[in-house]
């Protein structure tokens, strides 16, 4: 109790700190009070297993019918149940890839070609964009079939999100598809109208979070007269079963978070447990990876506190002390820290003790040092930015990006997300590879930093803060803000192309490693859509979270 009073006194006594005045948690005790119903969950599992066997059998039977198999794979993926059929889908796509040329060589079927391209490309097949050449209509147009016009162009648009560097035909297809869909959207009826709207103004199949996209697509799919009853029922049951898992995990995490007493001990910090869980469950979403997911959420919560400490509260001298404590990594450092920092440091050491026990149990103790090194990377980035702010320095674009891609935290979080993975996938070599910043990693952390900065310009201007990437680039290249913004957005698109290219076979490391990187970028599409929804949790994000974690699908 004495420590709490000291902390409050310290915090309230210093009016000169650059406080950000973040809004409080919007969820209250909603998840803390959750009571599971094990009998209900147990009753759903046999039904799910029966439906899985039915779908598995039908997918195999469809191997002699190209379009039937193609549409089944697409539906499984869009409905968010791809993880239930990984081996079956691998076999189906192998079959589709072997038959693609024969099926499409004499056809000008935009829907079939675009859908085939997307599914094969996103699973690593090096299918050439030349398949679209025969569908071109002039320099920038494409031949659109009168039947299924809207869905064919939707698939073309979705396919363009898999493009890599140098694929001019897909760059042009992206522009064409958007213009075409915008021109016909008002004349469409549901469910096609909803699917077109999502393709235009939502998140693409490639860049969208799997759970968010599945939750949107399930009711759309149900409205199609041709929907597969077994797939629809399986997707609904699986979604609702996973929702109970999310509620259970959020309840456990809420107890841990409550014990930290964040509102009292760290009133300057953002209270964003549920939003952090949404973030990390979008990266590590597999039910079997529950322990790794819980650790990742706790680590990101603590990183968020550190971010706010360096960004919106700590004095430069205090930040120096904390940086030294992180680099030393020893409980003896507590004595040197102000009381509010002790809360964060003790919690961090506690979480890493749990990580150490897990790594010993898994026989992967070497990972602990990588996790610690990742924390030192993000804190080191925070401190350099604090030094720039203290000294009123103006970094060049290159200097800014070298530091800001670290302080964004995504390198640290991606490394942390590897901790619970199988030993033969997240090997020592995989950790070293990611830390070396290969092209795909560099693209991801650059994309993450720039996406964050685009929506954070006005927020950062409100208080003493270093310039964002947009402002640094604008100043260095003597551009207007609009011109700098265009260039930054071009760099983001370039990053997505690099990420897409990394998935083409043969890959440097197993695709589960790459999916951790991709999934973080997918979450950013939602978190930083038009604004910083993590800092200011808007009604749109609240609605997404409610759909995922509160309201089951009827």
From Swiss-Prot:
Cofactor(s) the protein needs: Mg(2+)
Keywords: Cytoplasm, Lyase, Magnesium, Metal-binding
Binding site for Mg(2+) 2: 307, 311
GO molecular function, one term: magnesium ion binding
Catalyses which reaction(s): (2E,6E)-farnesyl diphosphate = (-)-germacrene D + diphosphate
Positions that bind Mg(2+) 1: 307, 311
Cellular component GO terms held in the UniProt record: cytosol
Pathway: Secondary metabolite biosynthesis; terpenoid biosynthesis
Residue ranges of the motif DDXXD motif: 307-311
SUPFAM superfamilies linked: Terpenoid cyclases/Protein prenyltransferases, Terpenoid synthases
A Pfam family annotated for this UniProt entry: Terpene_synth
Subcellular location: Cytoplasm, Cytosol
Binding site for Mg(2+) 3: 452, 460
EC annotation from Swiss-Prot or TrEMBL: 4.2.3.75
One record GO biological process: farnesyl diphosphate metabolic process
Cofactor binding comment, as recorded: Binds 3 Mg(2+) ions per subunit.
Annotated PANTHER family: ALPHA-HUMULENE_(-)-(E)-BETA-CARYOPHYLLENE SYNTHASE, OS04G0344100 PROTEIN-RELATED
Family of this protein: Belongs to the terpene synthase family.
UniProt note: domains: The Asp-Asp-Xaa-Xaa-Asp/Glu (DDXXD/E) motif is important for the catalytic activity, presumably through binding to Mg(2+).
Role, per record: Sesquiterpene synthase involved in germacrene D biosynthesis.
Protein name, UniProt field: Germacrene D synthase 2
């Amino acid at each position: 109790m004495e420590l709490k009073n000291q902390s409050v006194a310290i915090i309230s006594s210093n009016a000169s700190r650059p406080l950000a005045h973040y809004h409080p948690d919007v969820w209250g005790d909603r998840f803390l009070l959750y009571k599971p119903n094990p009998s209900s969950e147990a009753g759903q599992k046999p039904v799910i297993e029966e439906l899985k066997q039915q779908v598995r059998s039908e997918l195999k039977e469809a191997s002699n019918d190209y379009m039937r198999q193609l549409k089944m794979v697409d539906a499984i993926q869009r409905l968010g149940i791809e993880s239930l059929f990984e081996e079956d889908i691998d076999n189906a796509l192998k079959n589709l890839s072997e038959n693609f040329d024969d099926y499409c060589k004499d056809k000008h079927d935009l829907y079939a070609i675009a859908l085939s391209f997307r599914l094969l490309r996103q699973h690593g097949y090096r299918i050439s964009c030349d398949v679209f050449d025969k569908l071109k209509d002039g320099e920038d147009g494409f031949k659109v079939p009168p039947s299924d016009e809207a869905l064919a162009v939707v698939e073309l648009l979705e396919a363009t999100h898999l493009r890599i560097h140098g694929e001019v035909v897909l760059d042009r297809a992206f522009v064409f598809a958007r213009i075409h869909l915008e021109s016909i959207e008002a004349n469409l009826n549901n469910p096609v109208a909803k699917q077109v709207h999502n393709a235009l103004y939502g998140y693409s199949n490639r860049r969208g979070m799997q759970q968010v996209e599945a939750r949107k697509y399930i009711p759309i799919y149900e409205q199609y007269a041709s929907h597969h009853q077994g797939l629809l029922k399986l997707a609904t049951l699986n979604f609702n079963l996973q929702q109970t898992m999310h509620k259970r995990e959020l309840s456990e995490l809420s107890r841990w978070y409550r014990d930290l007493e964040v509102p009292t001990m760290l009133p300057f910090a953002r209270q964003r447990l549920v939003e952090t869980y949404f973030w990390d469950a979008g990266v590590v979403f597999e039910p079997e990876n529950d322990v790794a997911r819980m650790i990742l959420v706790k680590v990101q919560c603590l990183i968020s506190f550190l971010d706010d400490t360096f960004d919106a509260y700590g004095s430069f001298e205090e930040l120096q002390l904390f940086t030294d404590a992180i680099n030393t990594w020893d409980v003896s450092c507590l004595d040197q820290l102000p009381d509010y920092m002790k809360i964060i440091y003790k919690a961090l050491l506690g979480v890493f003790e749990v990580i150490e026990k897990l790594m010993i149990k898994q026989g992967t103790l070497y990972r602990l040092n990588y996790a610690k090194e990742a924390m030192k990377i993000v804190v080191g980035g925070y401190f350099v930015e604090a030094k720039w702010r203290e000294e009123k320095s103006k970094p060049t674009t290159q200097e800014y990006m070298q530091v800001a891609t670290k302080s964004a935290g995504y390198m640290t979080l991606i490394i942390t997300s590897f901790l619970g993975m199988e030993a033969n996938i997240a090997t020592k070599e995989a950790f070293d590879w990611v830390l070396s910043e290969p092209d795909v990693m560099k693209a991801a952390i650059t994309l993450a930093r720039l996406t964050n900065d685009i929506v954070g310009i006005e927020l950062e201007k409100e208080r003493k803060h270093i310039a964002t990437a947009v402002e640094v680039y604008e100043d260095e290249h003597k551009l207007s803000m609009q011109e700098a913004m265009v260039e930054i957005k071009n760099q983001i698109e370039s990053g997505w192309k690099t990420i897409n290219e990394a998935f083409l076979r043969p890959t440097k490391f197993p695709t589960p490693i790459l999916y951790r990187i991709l999934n973080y970028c997918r979450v950013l599409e939602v978190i930083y859509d038009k604004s910083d929804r993590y800092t200011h949790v808007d009604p749109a994000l609240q609605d997404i979270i409610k759909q995922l974690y509160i309201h089951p699908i009827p």
